Regions:
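Generic alpha-helical structural signal
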Residues: 10, 100, 232-239, 281, ...
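Short glycine/proline-enriched turns and hinge-like loops at secondary-structure junctions
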Residues: 133-136, 207, 305-310
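Flexible, membrane-facing loop/turn or short amphipathic-helix motifs
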Residues: 22, 225, 305-306
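Solvent-exposed soluble domains appended to multi-pass membrane proteins
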Residues: 230, 255-493
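Membrane-interface segments at or immediately adjacent to transmembrane helices
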Residues: 144-150, 191-285, 290
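Short, acidic/polar
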Residues: 45, 49, 237-242, 389-392
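Short, conserved active-site loops that position catalytic residues or coordinate cofactors/metal ions
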Residues: 18-33, 58-65, 217-219, 249-266, ...
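Membrane-embedded alpha-helical bundles of multi-pass enzymes
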Residues: 1-202, 243-244, 412-413, 423-426, ...
Length: 493
């Protein structure tokens, strides 16, 4: 049992490399210990078990913020949050187990081959984790080394390839421990070559900054947002933070679900239609003459014009006249958050989805680029859609920036900084600036190199006034997507 306990403890330690702790050297050391445990496993089943227990420890700590989301919905007992974290971790641990098993099966006879196969397997299993069963791409280990120069591998091999680089670094630590100096040197040279190639693949420096923008963070907690009677205070906070006296054209950015009443609906009732039009005018009155607003909101849908049968979680483009110029509908919905799987069964048990309301959201068509007046081409990723590497941009119509409105008020102290780190990696690998607006933090301006230019702290009301950072030319990853990390994994083996 000792190896399994060591594997579990190593998994716990590995999670400390992510935000808000950021002890990435400890993450690499923990992965080195996992590799040693795989190396000494007496058989395939033992290697699989050690990888699985490592994964359980890793995900239980790294995903602890999920439990917080269950405290805001009366129909979902808060205690279910901890159970959800454990059950999700038990499932996600299958992927580290698979990587460990493949490394043992194909690499156990040679230490250098062991780490190469492990790194390749880790790339593939993280990619699979992001896609199977709706996908959950949170915290690939490449995020842990975002603060290091090795993150420049991302424009070439993407986030999953960067995770492979992190696995190679852990393997180098093991080789040094085993005094395999030549093998360690060869692996280190390979890692350096990938990072250098990624840096060169980034292309020329971005051009000058673009139009003015303001990001609004109203500091509205989840416990207040849907509280009865709070709608007027919600709009007043947005008004106070949005108003300005300038005459220059400006892009104004509000968070996900900033407007809590529907900006569009499919109901025929004149009262609902009038209420919707009045709401649009109320929003338009907050804008300057040349402002353009991007705001999160909802659309009601009705099959018969009388009752709401579904909804969309959307970003609306609104001008000073109160016109909705365009809309992006979130495509990658959160199961149990934005829709309830097996609704007839689970609702009969008294359960509901985490987001308020008793109808499910419909998914949109996917990544989409909208051409905004004066501003130019914009891409949209709502909330956790930004975590899916290779899926955030319409490659046939590349935008000049990505807007990532989110409601991270659900996710306690650990979720927001982890979410921000993953948004930074999307900027780096795609060569596009990312703008984030959230109700409680962390709102931010990220340049095309993944650098955090400006941000607002968690649980703070305020604005960010700046200019739109320029994009880089398309990176290799922006052109080819996740073909590149998969090719990288083939090269490793």
């Amino acid at each position: 049992m000792k190896p399994l306990a060591y594997a579990f403890l190593a998994g716990l330690a590995a999670a400390t490399g992510f935000e808000p702790i950021g002890l990435w050297p400890l993450t690499l050391a923990a992965f080195a210990l996992l590799l040693r445990l795989v190396r000494t496993a007496p058989g395939l089943r033992s290697a699989l078990a050690r990888g699985w227990w490592f994964g359980v420890g890793h995900f239980v700590v790294g995903l602890n913020w999920i439990a917080t989301a269950f405290t805001y919905q009366a129909e979902m007992p808060a205690s279910l949050g901890y159970l959800a974290v454990v059950l999700l971790s038990l499932y996600l641990a299958v992927y580290p187990a698979a990587a460990a098993g493949l490394a043992w099966r194909w690499g156990r006879k040679d230490d250098l081959r062991l780490i190469l196969v492990f790194a390749a397997a880790w790339i593939v299993t993280e990619w699979l984790r992001a896609g199977l069963f709706t996908g959950f791409a949170w915290n690939p280990i490449g995020v842990a080394i975002l603060a290091t120069p090795l993150s420049w591998s991302a424009p070439l091999v993407g986030t999953y390839g960067l995770s492979g680089v992190a696995a190679l670094l852990a393997g180098i630590l093991l080789l040094l421990f085993l005094r395999r100096w030549r093998s360690a040197g060869a692996a280190a040279a390979g890692v350096a070559a990938v990072a250098l190639a990624g840096f060169l693949a980034g292309g020329p420096a971005p051009g000058p900054a673009g139009p003015s923008l303001r990001i609004v963070q109203p500091n509205i907690g989840q416990q207040d947002k849907w509280r009865e009677g709070f709608q007027e205070e919600n709009m007043e906070r947005l008004r106070r933070l949005s108003t300005w006296g300038g005459s220059e054209p400006r892009l104004l950015l509000w968070p996900e679900a900033a407007v809590t009443r529907p900006l569009e609906n499919g109901l025929d009732d004149p009262g609902h239609i009038m209420e919707m039009l009045e709401l649009r005018q109320e929003v338009a009155d907050m804008l300057g003459d040349k402002d353009l607003l991007l705001t999160g909101g909802v659309t009601w849908r009705s099959a018969d014009g009388r009752d709401v049968t579904s909804a969309t979680n959307s970003v609306f483009v609104i001008d000073k006249a109160g016109r909705i110029l365009s809309r992006y509908d979130k495509a990658h919905l959160v199961p149990y958050g934005e829709y309830l799987p097996m609704r007839p069964i689970l609702s009969s048990l008294g359960l509901s989805r985490l987001a308020p309301g008793d109808v499910d959201f419909d998914p949109g068509p996917g990544a989409r680029t909208l051409d905004l007046p004066v501003i130019g081409k914009a891409g949209f990723q709502l909330c956790y859609e930004i975590i899916f590497s290779g899926e955030v941009v319409d490659r046939k119509n590349r935008p000049a920036f990505l807007f990532n409105p989110s409601n991270d008020a659900w996710f306690g102290a650990w979720g927001p900084p982890q979410h921000l780190a993953q948004a930074r990696l999307r900027a780096l690998e795609e060569g596009l600036p990312v703008l984030r607006s959230t109700p409680t933090g962390i709102s931010a301006v990220i340049d095309a190199d993944g650098r955090l230019l400006k941000s607002l702290p968690w649980r703070t009301a305020g604005v960010i006034d700046t200019r739109l950072p320029a994009p880089r030319p398309p990176t290799p990853f922006a052109r080819l997507g996740n073909i590149l990390p998969l090719l990288f994994s083939l090269v490793l083996v």
